[in-house]
From Swiss-Prot:
This is Uncharacterized protein E111R. Belongs to the asfivirus E111R family. It comes from African swine fever virus (isolate Tick/South Africa/Pretoriuskop Pr4/1996) (ASFV).
Amino acid sequence: MSFSECPLVISACKKFLQKRITIENEALINALITALAQTTTLNDLCLLPIQTYLLSYKNAFEWIHFVCIAITTILDSKYNWKDCTVDINYIFLHVTYIYNIKTKEYLDYCS
């Protein structure tokens, strides 16, 4: 499957991007996109920022922002994924676990 077959993820990320994109984040975004070449599932995409980039950022919203940037960027390059069954809520749940923030706050923020 490709991300073009995952409308829920695409829609949620694009909505989030419209509110969060900034030029200042370019360096980290590029680093994350580069690292995506090593991932094969949406699950990996969710975990990758935690393991590599998240620790230097205190704002949980920043992580979601970077993940969404990566997803929407690779849409244009027809990046193939083995698993597109995980919806955007999965990403929020990971952040909720680490930061102890209610998922509803993220859903409201992205709606």
